[in-house]
């Protein structure tokens, strides 16, 4: 198996030892208290919000019919989480993937992003990205009342959940009778660059025995600086490193996630209800990129580590761009009894939008450059000419403007029916769902000249700000400075630059997809003396159609429509065995199917009859099919306490990765004879996918054993050891993208005297990011860690109002995120962003 070179920093070794010392200390403390006075059975009950949230989450887990981890709303409020990825990343076996430090994707039990399905209040949400991949940075944490992270799925859950199914429960008017509300305001600073941090949220509801209404809104906004050293290509020789190219960036980022929603309910006298629910979420990211690229490949007789390039070349790129992801959900539903049945009907309209627009002027230059790459992670490059005086030469960039852009809109309509009843064995449930999706998108890099928009290279230099050196506390390898990118963008727009429409997309990048999924299921819960058994069967029928291009006899592009249909029977079985009142065993066998993403399976492609090749989408991809086994032991040994260990195994066939395969060339061009095999480069099916691991979870509190000031201490610890593998189309064996061998979370908290303090540490080992066809060794992210501190003070005793003041301190370790190719000697991206601090107040009534 191709694996990254082992490289554990002293900081990580110290963190691992610290975790071990913490566990040892906790064990000794409990042993001492028990030996001296025995376990205290009667304690004084006091208001402890961390304890209340732990009780809520643990009891929900304990009473579930399947293997699940639960996050309560109170627990979310006790951590400095700004989106759902951060909140879920604290659960056992759940890891976070970040972009510029922001939690964005989830690797659920070490699985690729697309193996996790997501729902709001039981309504399945297609992936904002590629139709399959959830973007969790689009969903603020404050909109949720509870999160159910299902690790072993039942038949009433979507079959797409290979690794897990995350059901996000939002607030309902009937949660609290009468008028209720809450608000949150926080402000702070990002220490690198001094950017502002602002948080706002509010919720208001009313309900009685006839109707209920609820409205909410939230916004979190951050101004951030990111320093990024990437794409440093080097050759390792005896005596050191010879650099060839390097790109260094400094980003000024202004990003926000927003959410708003409303619910109206009318209650029937018979016990049913009819309701309408609306949810709108948006992630918006404005980004200024200041980039220098240096090319040293023309050096004659280069020397390792240090040297001089008399004729180095490169370019400078200046961008003011935007990324936007939105999710809009409208649901009309009703719940009502019919005879002995409880019936639920939902009709949902869902619209997803994902787009980016990056207009990018870039100018070429040539100059002498002295280099020092003795430390490849902190290189230094010195130009002969001061950067402010460096002239941009059209010889080195004839094309000096490119308009990068892309957009995908997905419309989804769902009809969902569920009904359950009691029978002689226990409970029986059945249901059906019709799911229709339409996706339309495209992307391009439209090249041009600044002169087309009324700008010269000299005019661009007028926007430079040499006195504004890059904000950085780590590296500025060239002494870079900022440019007024926003002013330059405004000038480009005034000159006619626009966000293009799909008619300007590259033909080989168009995404046109229609998909229909019909699902039926039935499940029987059998109640027994020892617990319960749940047997289920789900059937999913998929019709997939995509439109792309083929060549006619004259070599012109004409539409090509490819349709695929497949059906999947997905059985499942769950056993819950209560050993006694405190301990429980669980065992599950599940099956699932992961469909190709829209971009992967699009029919559009570039066609080359001369090379007998096709590059682009692969509409002939097979869906990934899996079966899995879960075993779990849960010990609820004290109030708000748990020790749990679980083991899991997943076998996945037809693993989809970037790569090459062969197709019938005559489908794409009459130049090929029927059956003639051409090479298709894009996505392909691998084989022999396997994912297995062990998870540990421990939560305990000293107030289960003692009273007094020290009884306020407690710990939350979880750990996952995971291994995965698959065989790529080229025959090489890799770990599955997203698998870290080791992940863990450690939290030490104290709550007493209206104060709650929580120190949290998160760690994940290195993991494979991509298996791009042109990168034989794969791209990996190196190990990552985060240290966070949360402080809360309850004001109710002082003021009579339910309110707290809080402080959140994030990324206190100021950790660098590093990506590399093949092994850690070849870093291709090093990101730093600094710590973040927020103060705020939260109140409710």
Task: Name the predicted role of every residue range.
Residues 192-294, 315, 319-343, 571-573:
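Transmembrane beta-barrel wall of Gram-negative outer-membrane proteins
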Residues 96, 123-151, 202:
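Short acidic/polar hinge/loop motifs at secondary-structure boundaries
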Residues 85-124, 151:
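Extracytoplasmic beta-strand/coil segments of soluble accessory domains associated
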Residues 310-327, 505, 511-518, 564, ...:
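Outer-membrane beta-barrel signature, preferentially recognizing the C-terminal barrel domain
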Residues 649-651, 663, 668-770, 842:
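Gram-negative outer-membrane beta-barrel transporters
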Residues 713, 765-770, 791-845:
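C-terminal beta-signal and adjacent terminal beta-strands/loops
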Residues 44-77, 105, 113, 123:
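N-terminal periplasmic "start-of-domain" segments of outer-membrane beta-barrel proteins
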Residues 84-87, 104-107, 119, 134-135, ...:
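N-terminal periplasmic accessory domains that precede
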